[in-house]
From Swiss-Prot:
The encoding gene: pyrE
The protein's Enzyme Commission number: 2.4.2.10
tRNA processing among keywords: no
Recorded superkingdom: Bacteria
Family annotation (InterPro entries): OPRT, Or_phspho_trans_dom, PRibTrfase_dom, PRTase-like
HAMAP family: PyrE
Protein name stated in the entry: Orotate phosphoribosyltransferase
Membrane is among the record's keywords: no
Lineage: Bacteria, Bacillati, Bacillota, Clostridia, Eubacteriales
GO CC terms: cytoplasm
CDD domains (alphabetical): PRTases_typeI (cd06223)
């Protein structure tokens, strides 16, 4: 496992983003782990988060993109901090934009924030966590309505590796439906591999008991 992936897992734990216990997802699934990206709340945390996204983007997409698109609302700060990190860490100066949930009828009108989209632009979508892929199905018509863009891919922070609308994971469904690359900074398989029986700040987060519950969860909800 790449060093930045291990650092990112530690970072999520430090920020209280990745936790283990008893939770219920929006879809009603009882889950033994939870990824709450709303817990990235400070400037230094957002800076580091952008650096992790930039590292994963460099590995998976090199510099084959013109624009980072962050779907509203959580994707907005992600596209901003990631574009800054790409510039500062890799000298890649990329544009960013996001959509408005509500179209303005005064001042800077239109549905987009940040850069405008042009025909032929290579767009990389930056998201937080995709469980069912709903935001991507909403994003694609928005992008295509603005210009004849070429969507190069989607990157998220954590692939939960759960079934989406069918038997496959949401990322696999999106990749097959739209024909572009999908990837994550880390997968839950990598998280489990790294944390299983490993002491972090004096605590073992994934004990044998927790690992057993995670295994049972994936038997029921894991992607094929």
């Amino acid at each position: 496992m790449k060093a930045y992936k291990k650092e990112f897992i530690n970072f999520m734990i430090e920020c209280g983003v990745l936790t283990f216990g008893d939770f219920v997802t929006k879809s009603g699934r009882k889950t033994p782990f939870f990824v709450n990206t709303g817990n990235y709340q400070t400037g230094s945390q957002l800076r580091r988060l952008g650096e992790f996204y930039a590292e994963a983007i460099k590995e998976n997409f090199a510099d084959d993109y013109d624009v980072l698109f962050g779907p509203a609302y959580k994707g907005i700060p992600l596209s901003v901090t990631t574009s800054i990190a790409l510039s500062s860490s890799f000298d890649i100066d990329v544009r960013y934009c996001s959509n408005r949930k509500e179209v303005k009828d005064h001042g800077d009108t239109g549905i987009l924030l940040g850069s405008k989209l042009n025909d032929g632009d290579k767009v990389l979508i930056v998201e937080d966590v995709t469980t069912a892929g709903t935001s991507i199905y909403e994003t694609m018509p928005i992008l295509k309505s603005q210009a004849d863009v070429n969507v190069k891919g989607l990157i998220i922070s954590v692939d939960r590796m759960e079934r989406g609308q069918g038997e496959q994971s949401a990322l696999t469904e999106i990749r097959e439906k739209f024909g572009f690359k999908t990837c994550a900074i880390v997968t839950m398989a990598e998280v489990i591999e790294y944390l299983y029986n490993k002491e972090i700040n004096g605590t073992i987060l994934i004990t044998d008991e927790v690992k057993g519950r995670i295994d049972e969860y994936y038997k029921q909800y894991g992607a094929k």
